[in-house]
Design a protein with these regions (language model features):
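Basic nucleic-acid-binding interfaces
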Residues: 1-104
Length: 104
């Protein structure tokens, strides 16, 4: 039985960077990365300065390891796809440290 989690996380410096240009890329990246781990996105909302996700994570995966994977890989994939982001964020840090999580 999977557990449902509401997760919220933000870009570094809470920059309002998630706009039309990057929304579709992030959506595709999140869906691809989640499918690799067997995580189901029940609902997701990309806001200009943060991301809300309702996900179902298999019990064998901890929330912290999943979030490290999701934020780490999505940052690398965004920098590969949109090289201009490196100038805004430098050092390949797209997401801010930490996240909010609650069981549903």
């Amino acid at each position: 039985m999977d557990v449902f989690y509401h997760i919220v996380f933000t870009p570094k410096y809470r920059r309002k960077i998630i706009n039309n240009q990057y929304q579709s890329s992030l959506g595709e990246i999140f869906h691809r990365l989640c499918s690799y781990k067997g995580v189901e996105i029940i609902e997701g909302h990309l806001m200009p300065d943060h991301v809300h996700m309702l996900v179902s994570i298999p019990p064998r995966i901890s929330v912290s390891s999943f979030m490290g994977y999701l934020k780490g890989k999505s940052a690398l994939m965004m920098f590969d796809k949109h090289a201009n982001l490196k100038y805004k964020f430098g050092n390949r840090h797209f997401w801010a440290e930490g996240y909010y999580v609650s069981t549903v």
